[in-house]
Amino acid sequence: MTKIIFMGTPDFSATVLKGLIENPSYQLLAVVTQPDRAVGRKKEIKMSPVKEVALEHHIPVYQPEKLSGSQELESIMSLDADGIVTAAFGQFLPTKLLDSVTFAVNVHASLLPKYRGGAPIHYALINGEEEAGVTIMEMVKEMDAGDMIAKASTPILEDDNVGTMFDKLAILGRDLLIKTLPDYLSGQLKPVAQNHAEATFSPNITSEQEKLDFTKSARAIFNQVRGMNPWPIAHTYFNGERFKIYELLAIEGQGAPGQVIEKTKDSLIVATGSGAVSLRVVQPSGKPKMTIKDYLNGLGRDIKVGDYFGQ
């Protein structure tokens, strides 16, 4: 039985962890995840999805703010694990930890060498990619630059967003890891080096990237909105107040970018630099998320053709 330490934090990671737990070939010695955080308006302390899974299965949990130089690091190294598996962990592993195990692999949510970094699924959608995927790779000191053990892809559909793609890729990554790890550990599956010249990067989304620019094409705005749903959520401004947009459609239409060019009882069409967008699910400042129909029947009843978003 291969003794493993698992490292990760979000739901994506938890799905991969469950796959390892359910496989009798592996013994989970410990889980390393981010500390519990205060979330939401009420600032309730919440544990990570990975911690929840670990506690359900009575697996010891370590939660260092930063693994390198921590007391937890020494405890983790003393466990005498065969290897480490990470998935969306978000920290570099110290060299001495990597040197202390026989193997260390990462489940990364992109088709490397494209989209190294912390937000690969967001960028795949924002950039209008037609497919996304996962790569099982060896861990090295450079971010997501290790040799590739296996890759798998899946189409990005028109109704996909970050949430749906996270779910799809978590399952894809889990299954690919379970399928290929035995052959990798036995030496039958040889890793392949990445072409570093083709590497692209996906740093964490900034607040400036969340802001919609209606001079862009309708298709680009559509991709930006779904590439930030359900987090961090794209936004614009209306009458000087922040206005979040969860869903919209790219359609035909002409007008000045940001201008309302059509309004009915259940639709609101806004012009872009090329084409137009039909708003579907929105969230005015300080209000809950709602359909555009509910918005127009209430808070947005006074919006008229000729008004502008983005101001």
From Swiss-Prot:
Keywords: Protein biosynthesis, Transferase. It comes from the Bacteria. GO terms for molecular function: methionyl-tRNA formyltransferase activity. One of its GO terms (cellular component) is cytosol. It holds the Pfam family Formyl_trans_N. (6S)-5,6,7,8-tetrahydrofolate binds at residues 110-113. PROSITE patterns: GART (PS00373). Belongs to the Fmt family. HAMAP family: Formyl_trans (MF_00182). This is Methionyl-tRNA formyltransferase. It comes from Streptococcus uberis (strain ATCC BAA-854 / 0140J).
